[in-house]
């Protein structure tokens, strides 16, 4: 696509969930939000930030075998270095470079239980400058994926107040960016899927 390249994943609830499935769905969402909200000093790579995403899952004794995210090229490859998020260096991957302004990186934590189910929430983040002060140049991310996270999979009791605010703010952004392009029926659907929790 000459307009650019994107990568997105959503898991949608299609029936009743067990308590375990709902806990995993909620924790994946929390992991995604935590990384997206990072503020960090210039010079960090995804190796420094990966724990923000994996942390909630590691607290449960769960991990996913892949990286948390990868760089995204423009009219090139969907998976492209030198940026990415993972907790350890993998020699054959070119994804441990410093995060620079304008780099786009996916944020895609997940839970994958063989023979049972998989859950992933994936957005794209663009690295932007935040404030500069006596400690140095701070960086942060802006979310550039505008698709709702299925609230039927979320247990608000498993989220902190901060995480609920982040999810509500994300859904407000989705509504504001997407609703002007939809017809009445589509707007009603989006309104339900971006409601506050």
Description of each model-found segment:
Residues 1-197:
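Active-site neighborhoods and metal-handling regions in enzymes and metal-associated proteins
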């Amino acid at each position: 696509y000459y307009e650019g390249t994107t990568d997105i994943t959503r898991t949608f609830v299609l029936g009743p969930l067990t308590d375990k499935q709902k806990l995993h769905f909620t924790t994946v969402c929390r992991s995604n939000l935590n990384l997206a909200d990072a503020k960090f000093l210039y010079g960090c790579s995804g190796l420094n930030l990966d724990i923000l995403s994996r942390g909630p899952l590691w607290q449960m004794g769960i991990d996913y075998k892949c990286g948390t995210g990868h760089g995204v090229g423009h009219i090139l490859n969907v998976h492209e270095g030198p940026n990415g998020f993972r907790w350890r260096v993998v020699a054959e991957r070119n994804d441990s470079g410093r995060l620079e302004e304008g780099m786009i990186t996916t944020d895609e934590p997940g839970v994958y239980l063989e023979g049972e189910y998989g859950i992933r929430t994936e957005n794209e983040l663009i690295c932007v400058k935040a404030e500069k002060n006596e400690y140095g140049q701070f960086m942060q991310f802006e979310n550039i994926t505008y698709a709702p996270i299925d609230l039927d999979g979320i247990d608000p009791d498993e989220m902190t107040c901060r995480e609920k605010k982040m999810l509500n703010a994300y859904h407000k952004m989705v509504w504001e960016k997407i609703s002007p392009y939809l017809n009445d029926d589509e707007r009603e659907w989006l309104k339900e899927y971006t409601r506050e929790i």
